[in-house]
Amino acid sequence: MAVTPPRILSAPRVIGDVRATLGEGLCWSTRQQAIWWVDILEHRLYRDAAAGAHDAWSFDETISAVAERADGPGLAVTLRRGLALFDPATRALVRLDEPERERAGNRFNDGKCDAQGRFWGGTMDFAVREPTGAFYRFDAAGRAERAIDPGWIVTNGPTWTLDGRTMFVNDTVRRRVVAHAFDPATGAVGAARDWLAFGEADGHPDGMTTDAAGRLWIAHWGGACVTCHDPASAADNSVGAAATSV
């Protein structure tokens, strides 16, 4: 499928100068017209409204990914051990499944919902040394099922093609993007193939998303940029950033 390369209309600008230690997990809320994001290592959740208002909440452990709920108030968030529901208005926190209680050295990292509303989250070795990370699919009741087996030092993503039949995940330490066959009806993950590999000068592929034209946008940890790729993996554009780790 051919897509038109994106036009970059303006340079990146700072919307919240909070000097995060490890800022991640951007989630745009159409309902609130605001961006949710987290500082993983400082255990903080932020909301930056388009109108300029800035709010923050603190937790007792890492918080790494955010998704807005469709069937209830507040958010689904990944804490160190698993998924939880959090209502910013009341600060009520309800813990759901924690699938890696036996892996004391792991934590959850990136995550998001697919088009059917299932939440996906990946784990990683907190020390960034051992290949103990895996990917989990959470059902509507918050129960976790391991969808991709351990073997990952740092997981990031996922994101999907517009037709929902391919899921992309980032093998961050090994600098590669892996594409999996995907069944959107059941959430089943199929055969994997290397989709894109980066060199040392590119940094490490971190968070990513798919735009309305089907292009993948990939943040580069240590690469000071965000790159855009068409569905065949060819680079369409690059946006530089004032920070080395994006």
Question: Predicted regions: what is each one?
Answer:
Residues 11-17, 52-58, 94-101, 143-149, ...:
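A short beta-strand motif characteristic of beta-propeller blades
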Residues 17-32, 60-75, 102-118, 149-166, ...:
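Beta-rich, blade/repeat-based domains predominating
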Residues 29-30, 35-40, 76-81, 119-129, ...:
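Conserved beta-strand positions in repeat-built beta-propeller and related beta-rich domains
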Residues 71-73, 88, 136-143, 162, ...:
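Flexible "stalk/tail and boundary" regions
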Residues 91-148:
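Hydrophobic alpha-helical segments and helix pairs
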Residues 176, 197-233, 244:
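Loop/turn-rich, solvent-exposed surfaces of beta-rich toroidal or solenoidal domains
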Residues 180-187, 231-236:
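Short loop/turn segments immediately following beta-strands, especially the blade-tip
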